[in-house]
A protein has these predicted regions:
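Conserved proline-anchored active-site loop of SAM-dependent methyltransferases
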Residues: 1-2, 10-15, 151-172, 224-229
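A short acidic (Asp/Glu
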Residues: 2-3, 19-23, 152-155, 168-177, ...
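Class I S-adenosyl-L-methionine-dependent methyltransferase module
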Residues: 7-9, 13-132, 170-205, 210
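A short helix-to-beta-strand connector/capping loop
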Residues: 132-139
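Conserved SAM/SAH-binding loop
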Residues: 144-148
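Conserved Class I SAM-dependent methyltransferase catalytic core
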Residues: 201-256
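Class I S-adenosyl-L-methionine
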Residues: 242-288
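Conserved small/polar residues in nucleotide/adenosyl-binding loops
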Residues: 289-297
Length: 297
């Protein structure tokens, strides 16, 4: 659901997630039939031409032929958008369909830090037709640093889901981000990664607690809902939470009253560790410093 009766504001520092947010939540009108026609055309393609994807990723995360199709489709979406045949949301919907199709067949163990070598590529690219809604006209989608964005917006409820540990999302999903941006940078290493320095999150570093305190301080909302797990110091240094429970509670309680909800879950691992007692927690803060009246749209 896109919360059709509410005004929705989304933000993500990764362009790939921003594109998906545009596809699902943007208020721009789009043609369902146009989307269907493009996807039927893309799924009928039988090509094996050289392009950026074949030159850099053939027989790694995808077969050479699927790389050829991915590269052709992504370039065609851009060409059609620049020619005026697609509006911004239609472009986002088609890119989202491509990214989802890629992720469904990718030769990985759940992320793009590495690919499995010597495997048979038995699954091939097939785009599905997304079914987004015609949303409210005042929805907004952003692609920027959350700590800066919150200084300019206000809401009834702000939901925050920052990275928990030192594993940067731009590292784990570099290929998805690369195709979404389509700037065709040089890549290096076994994992074929581009330069990602501009996408690094402070929430994965020793600056996480300082960044968190700054974020909460500048939020203008009646409710703040934070998602953060209880890894603390249970795993290795890369897996451990960067923001302690003590800091979370101190910062939120300075803003208002806090209630915590939790649910157990099995953590994702590559089979090298077995960490038990994992909980996903929601920290709900009723802010004592917020806009005087809830926003009505």
């Amino acid at each position: 659901s896109a919360f059709l009766d509410k005004r929705l504001i989304t933000n993500d520092i990764l362009y790939s997630n921003y594109i998906c947010n545009l596809a699902w939540f943007s208020s721009e009108r789009f043609s369902k039939q146009k989307i269907i026609d493009y996807i039927l055309h893309y799924n009928s393609l039988d090509i094996n031409d050289e392009n950026y994807m074949t030159e850099n990723f053939a027989d790694t995360y995808f077969s050479r032929q699927d790389c050829s199709r991915i590269g052709f489709i992504r370039q065609d979406i851009e060409d059609e958008f620049l020619a005026g045949a697609l509006n911004e949301r239609e472009r986002a919907i088609l890119i989202t369909s491509l990214l989802y199709a890629m992720d469904k067949i990718a030769n990985t163990c759940g992320h793009y830090d590495a690919y499995r070598q010597g495997v048979e590529f038995d699954r091939h690219l097939e785009l599905a037709v997304p079914t987004p809604k015609q949303n409210r006209r005042k929805n907004q989608c952003y692609n920027e640093n959350a700590n800066e964005l919150v200084k300019r917006i206000q809401a009834d409820l702000v939901y925050i889901d920052p990275p928990y540990n030192s594993r940067q999302y731009c590292d784990a999903y570099h290929l998805i981000e690369n195709v979404a941006r389509w700037q065709m940078p040089e890549v290096s290493g076994v994992a074929r990664k581009p330069d990602r320095s501009a996408l690094k999150s402070e929430y994965c570093t020793r600056q996480a607690e300082t960044a968190f305190e700054d974020l909460i301080e500048h939020i203008t909302a009646r409710y703040i809902l934070l998602s953060y797990n209880n890894m603390a110091n249970k795993g290795n240094d890369r897996s451990n939470a960067k923001i302690s429970d003590e800091v979370i509670m101190r910062v939120l309680e300075a803003k208002g009253t806090v209630e915590v909800f939790s649910e157990t879950y099995k953590a994702f691992t590559t089979g090298k560790s077995n960490i038990e007692g994992n909980e996903e927690r929601l920290f709900l803060c009723l802010s004592l410093i917020h806009i005087s009246e809830p926003t009505r749209h």
